């Protein structure tokens, strides 16, 4: 439930600062949105330049939708729909291979990121990741419900994403961080669950031929994670692991794999906070060496979002304030910050390889908008953007 700004106890100066970062976040996202609708992950970062991820974009679109910019979010969903329509034949070929008893190669699966014109691109990447397809289903259904839009506009793309996930939801793949292709990751399963439940419970999609199957698979995901993805009362990084990951709160909010008031949800929030939260900034996982293993803006917002949903307004506000403190002189938010590094000795090699940390990261700005909205801290005119 969204909090009112008056419940946060902020003075006028801090409220103005948080409002200004929200306005800037909207401006950064929309300024860099491609003419075709894609949200670039990070417009100037060497390894991301020229590409858009469904994962980053789905959360970014949610932030923009909450801000009230229906047109910008709609253009992103138009872009994804168009990309997936053009992948109809590829998915049909994959499904036919499965029907023949074949196991398609990872290289034959849909990619996790696309060029702005919807192609795979020529740069090698850790491309087989299924989470973004579930995230997009959740994002587009949520956007349509919020603003009273007709999902027929995106129905062809929805069909492709659903068919793909129903066939390959339980296949090991790379995780949110593009690592460990050999495992089935709980945050990936959570994202798929969220997408399948979103379309399966949507009244406007009830007549779809896959409607019942989406909820059946979602139930199978819940059973699987309950049996193999919970250790010491909390969700874990992958099935069979005991470690936590900063992405795990997404399995609670927004993806509903575990209800927010469930003991597993509370234990997961607590485990992530204990192992990964330092002064309001959340790390990805304990073994993270990427740029030294810093604190990620988007994960701090994700934990804050979950705390807000659980009724911990003070805890959520702590994360929002921390995020606001990380903005650079231009107001831009990076992917991660180096104030507390888990493995500082590894930072230099990544700087040498790819340059300085991605800034701005549109996903960071989108997550700020989401958390600000949860706390009732979007600027008064934002909903009319």
From Swiss-Prot:
Keywords of this protein's UniProt record, alphabetized? Carbohydrate metabolism, Cytoplasm, Glycosidase, Hydrolase, Polysaccharide degradation
EC number of this enzyme: 3.2.1.205
Keyword Zinc-finger assigned: no
Reactions that this protein is recorded to catalyse: isomaltose + H2O = beta-D-glucose + D-glucose
> Span of the secretion signal?
none
GO: which molecular function terms?
hydrolase activity, hydrolyzing O-glycosyl compounds
Asked whether the UniProt record includes Cytoplasm among its keywords, one would answer yes
A Gene Ontology biological process noted in the UniProt record is: polysaccharide catabolic process
Task: Supply the SUPFAM superfamilies for this chain.
Answer: Six-hairpin glycosidases (SSF48208)
Question: Pfam families from the entry?
Answer: Glyco_hydro_15 (PF00723)
According to its UniProt record, this protein's enzyme class is hydrolase
* Temperature-related activity annotation: Optimum temperature is under 35 degrees Celsius.
| Compartments it resides in | Cytoplasm
Kindly state one GO CC term assigned in the UniProt record: cytoplasm
Stated family: Belongs to the glycosyl hydrolase 15 family.
Describe the task this protein carries out: Involved in the intracellular degradation of the cyclic tetrasaccharide cyclobis-(1-6)-alpha-nigerosyl (CNN) formed extracellularly from starch. Catalyzes the hydrolysis of alpha-1,6-glucosidic linkage from the non-reducing end of isomaltose to yield beta-D-glucose and D-glucose. Can also act on panose and isomaltotriose at a lower rate. It displays low or no activity toward CNN and the general GH15 enzyme substrates such as maltose, soluble starch or dextran.
Any idea what this protein is called?
Answer: Isomaltose glucohydrolase
User: Source species, please?
Assistant: Kribbella flavida (strain DSM 17836 / JCM 10339 / NBRC 14399)
Upper lineage? Bacteria, Bacillati, Actinomycetota, Actinomycetes, Propionibacteriales
């Amino acid at each position: 439930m969204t909090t009112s700004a008056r419940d946060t106890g902020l003075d006028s100066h801090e409220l103005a600062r948080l409002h200004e970062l929200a306005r800037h976040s909207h401006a950064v996202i929309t300024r860099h949105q491609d003419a075709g609708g894609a949200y670039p992950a990070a417009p100037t970062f060497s390894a991301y330049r020229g590409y858009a991820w469904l994962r980053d974009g789905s959360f970014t679109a949610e932030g923009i939708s909450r801000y009230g910019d229906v047109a910008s979010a709609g253009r992103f969903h138009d872009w994804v729909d168009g990309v997936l329509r053009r992948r109809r034949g590829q998915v049909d070929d994959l499904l036919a291979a499965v029907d023949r008893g074949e196991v398609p190669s990872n290289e034959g699966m849909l990619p996790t990121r696309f060029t702005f014109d919807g192609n795979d691109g020529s740069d090698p990447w850790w491309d087989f990741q299924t989470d973004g397809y579930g995230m997009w289903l959740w994002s587009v259904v949520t956007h349509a419900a919020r603003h009273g839009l007709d999902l027929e506009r995106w129905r062809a793309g929805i069909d492709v994403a659903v068919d793909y996930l129903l066939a390959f939801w339980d296949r090991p793949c790379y995780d949110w961080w593009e690592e460990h292709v050999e495992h089935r990751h709980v945050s990936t399963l959570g994202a798929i669950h969220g997408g399948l439940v979103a379309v399966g419970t949507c009244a406007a999609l009830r007549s779809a031929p896959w409607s019942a199957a989406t909820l059946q698979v979602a139930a199978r995901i819940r059973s699987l994670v309950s049996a193999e993805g919970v250790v010491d009362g909390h969700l874990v990084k992958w099935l069979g692991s005991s470690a936590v990951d900063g992405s795990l709160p997404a399995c609670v909010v927004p993806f509903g794999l575990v209800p927010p008031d469930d003991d597993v949800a509370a234990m997961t929030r607590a485990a992530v906070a204990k192992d990964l939260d330092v002064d309001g900034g959340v790390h990805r996982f304990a073994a993270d060496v990427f740029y030294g293993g810093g604190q990620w803006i988007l994960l701090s917002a994700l934990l804050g979002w979950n705390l807000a949903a659980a009724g911990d307004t003070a805890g959520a506000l702590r994360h929002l304030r921390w995020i606001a403190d990380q903005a650079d002189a231009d107001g831009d938010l990076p992917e991660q910050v180096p104030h507390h590094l888990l493995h500082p000795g590894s930072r230099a090699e990544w700087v040498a390889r790819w340059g300085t940390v991605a800034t701005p990261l549109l996903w960071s700005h989108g997550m700020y908008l989401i958390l600000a909205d949860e706390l009732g801290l979007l600027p008064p005119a934002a909903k009319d953007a």
